[in-house]
Amino acid sequence: MSLTAEQALRAYAAMMNTLDVSELEPLLADDFHYASQWVFAEIESKSAFLDYIVPKLDAIRKSGASVWAEMGWLDREFPGPCVVMAQGDKDNLITVVLAKVECGKIKRLDLCGAPSPNSAGRIGEYPGNNDLECLKGEQP
């Protein structure tokens, strides 16, 4: 079975919800790219991404900051699955994550402020965190 964009995004969401890169790492292409609309330089390899993300996940863990990665769907600009990221509170939406898959590997991930995370349909699934999945449909 070939890797889909949705499966790639679920692995990314699981990484962010568990602060553990082990599920995502084997899915990354060696020439993987990671881009953010808030960062000038694009990361252009799997090894450079791992050098970047592992300390970032450790810093989040040590700070005690709350991060939520929820599966979502975009209908307009980039129709298809996405991850909706929130920080501090699960409804404090900060970014949308999009994935591109080629040859069974994740070729790139893009963190975007446009399209707005508020334009994404949120489906209440938080891969890697069963406690958060129990919150489906609940309103704060």
Which residues make up each language-model segment?
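C-terminal and inter-domain tail/linker signature
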Residues: 1-140
